[in-house]
Amino acid sequence: MGEETIAAIATGAGEGGIGIVRISGADALQVAERIFRPRRGRPLGCRRSHTVTYGWVVTPGGDRIDEALALVMRGPHSYTGEDVVELQCHGGQLAVRRVLEQALQAGARLAEPGEFTRRAFLNGRLDLSQAEAVVDLIRAKTDRAMAAAVAHLRGSLRQAIGRIRERLMEMMAHLEADIDFPELELEVQTREEVAAGCAWCLGEVERLLGGARTGRILREGLRAVLAGRPNVGKSSLLNRLVRENRAIVTPIPGTTRDVIAEWVELGGVPVQLFDTAGLRPTDDPVERIGVARTHEALAQAHLVLVVVDAAAGLGPEDREWISQLPQGAARVGVANKIDLNPAFELSALREALGGAPVVGVSAETGEGFDALEAEVARVAGAFDASEELLVNARQAEAIRRARNHLRDAQATLESGLGDELVAIDLRAAWMALGEVTGETAGEELLDQIFSRFCIGK
């Protein structure tokens, strides 16, 4: 893969002030020289690294396509670790595409998705956790998600994994030396010292796994579902929270027949709000489909906003559907239309929710919405991102396997079985953790990871 010179558009689709075509590989400078004419001075191949040259992108016949800046970055001090040239032209779709076409005609190959970052990984510029952080940084929706991605890009996860693997390697070396050379009087760790090392590694692994759910929330968003009986004002609540008229609102019960999703940021966490069909028995086949989708949304929710009509009071129908809510999600009670019944007893709703927090609001006047947003932000903030070691699903799966192997090693030590069995478990944990940083990752895993990238990254 690394022997070919590749090129791709590195900026997003659509019109913009600047468009970038990235070229990387052993012949990147030669390819760029064939299509770029400096306004004055030496050709690109004679330019120093990390310099900018003004000129024109031209056809083989010398016709000018667009004026551009050429950035020369010689390997290994570039993103990919190879010679890289970036051509910055005007950001029109046609202009950027024409520049890319010239680069391909001059000898470059169109890059595959994620191929630039894959080359950075293969050339030792990034480990696998840092490569994945590039995607997280691009897709970050909040400051907290961005901070976590930047921490991984700096190598925080690599360093944490490295410390655990180093300790595992030290224990393996002592155990295997004693196994292979029993006749020598080597200074080796006692089984008690190995057990203490396993306990330390297990504690570090558990700490990393503690950030798995938070990492998923920051990447994918907190799923907050507005649920309640028909005509309690769920759609009005959604519109007020997202500050636009996104959902249709009428006084007719059952207006909302499908799930509507909108994004909002609260507490530094991206929150995806779902307006749902009202929960009630119905003979209407379309409404039944909507109610079924409401139950599907509830099953996947991180937070359920339990909406009741304060003007009508908390009735037995409300208590019935509240009692049937799936377990696992956080809950916040919302008594809407509180302006029509200021005497509504919030304590009754709190009791029905088993002590969950409740707020009284009015989607009509905006009363109580600061308190509601604060409660949602509190739930979102409960996913602590302070350590910034927020692993993704793939990384968590590898770390869980390492945890299982460490537990097996502990059990082997406690049972008094041979050191060779302990060493096998420790090596398996060491290998599993290596998948996080890519040190023990195979081609199939790399293909899977880098296929998530866009072309040009």
From Swiss-Prot:
Biological process according to GO: tRNA methylation; tRNA wobble uridine modification
Cellular localisation: Cytoplasm
UniProt domain TrmE-type G: residue ranges: 221-381
Annotated keywords: Cytoplasm, GTP-binding, Hydrolase, Magnesium, Metal-binding, Nucleotide-binding, Potassium, tRNA processing
TM stretches of this protein: none
Stretch forming the signal peptide: none
EC number(s) stated in the UniProt entry for this protein: 3.6.-.-
Main subcellular localisation: cytoplasm
Cofactors, names only: K(+)
Entry note: cofactor: Binds 1 potassium ion per subunit.
Family: Belongs to the TRAFAC class TrmE-Era-EngA-EngB-Septin-like GTPase superfamily. TrmE GTPase family.
The protein's name: tRNA modification GTPase MnmE
Organism: Symbiobacterium thermophilum (strain DSM 24528 / JCM 14929 / IAM 14863 / T)
Lineage of the species this protein comes from: Bacteria, Bacillati, Bacillota, Clostridia, Eubacteriales
Gene: mnmE
